[in-house]
């Protein structure tokens, strides 16, 4: 009789449905893998406010939560929104629940992470809508708009093309992007204990995805 696998649990707050769909897809992919040493449980809420998410959690002991958030643009409104999110993650440490918030940001958006599963996406974009062409190329699709791509049925059609190997490819491509940013002399911004680049592409969502795969013996 096969040995029963232990379950690793991960906590998230995300800003949109696509991020949640992705995390549940990854959970199911790992849990169906014979190679995985552990099962995965994902506690993920669509919640733009990290502080509200933390306050509503019923937990005991030290807990790590990852907030997946988009940089959106360098417009002052979006930059302020981004920094307000960081402030809330910092404040979540002070509510007496022993919560540590980690930041899985994407610049511009989570769609960059989806593209990296299939192809490189190293060039800077002037607008989020410019992800549509590489998305269509990566997934051999003909989505008419970003909203069309994010329709639940269409987004899952992209996920269904992916494997653990594609996730590992995305991690490696993301690491190369961040290394290139450093080599290009971009300034790593520091704000309330969190780091990020103003320049796109840049992203840190790969850190928690890599950790999940490592914890399950898949990397």
State the predicted function of each range.
Residues 11-21:
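Catalytic nucleophile-elbow at a beta strand-turn-alpha helix junction centered on a G-D-S/GDSL motif
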Residues 13, 67-70:
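Conserved beta-strand segments of the P-loop GTPase G domain that flank and frequently precede/overlap
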Residues 41-48:
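Acidic-and-aromatic substrate-binding clefts and catalytic sites of carbohydrate-active enzymes
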Residues 1-7, 20-40, 52-59, 63-64, ...:
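C-terminal accessory helical subdomains adjacent to catalytic cores in phosphodiester-
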């Amino acid at each position: 009789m096969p040995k029963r696998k232990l379950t690793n649990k991960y906590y998230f707050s995300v800003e949109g449905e696509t991020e949640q769909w992705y995390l549940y897809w990854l959970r199911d992919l790992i849990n169906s893998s014979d190679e995985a040493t552990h099962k995965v449980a994902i506690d993920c809420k669509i919640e733009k406010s990290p502080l509200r998410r933390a306050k509503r959690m019923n937990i005991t002991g030290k807990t790590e939560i990852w907030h997946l958030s988009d940089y959106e643009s360098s417009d002052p409104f979006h930059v302020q929104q981004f920094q307000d999110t960081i402030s809330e993650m910092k404040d979540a440490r002070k509510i007496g629940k022993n919560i540590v918030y980690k930041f899985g940001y994407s610049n511009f958006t989570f769609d960059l992470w989806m593209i990296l599963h299939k192809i490189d996406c190293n060039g800077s974009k002037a607008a989020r809508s410019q992800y549509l062409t590489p998305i269509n190329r990566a997934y051999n699709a003909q989505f008419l708009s970003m909203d069309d791509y994010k329709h639940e049925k269409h987004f899952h059609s992209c996920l269904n093309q992916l494997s653990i190997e594609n996730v590992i490819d995305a991690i490696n491509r993301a690491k190369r992007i961040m290394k290139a940013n450093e080599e290009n002399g971009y300034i790593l911004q520091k704000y309330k204990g969190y780091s990020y680049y103003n320049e796109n592409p840049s992203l840190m969502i790969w850190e928690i995805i890599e950790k999940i795969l490592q914890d399950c013996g898949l990397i």
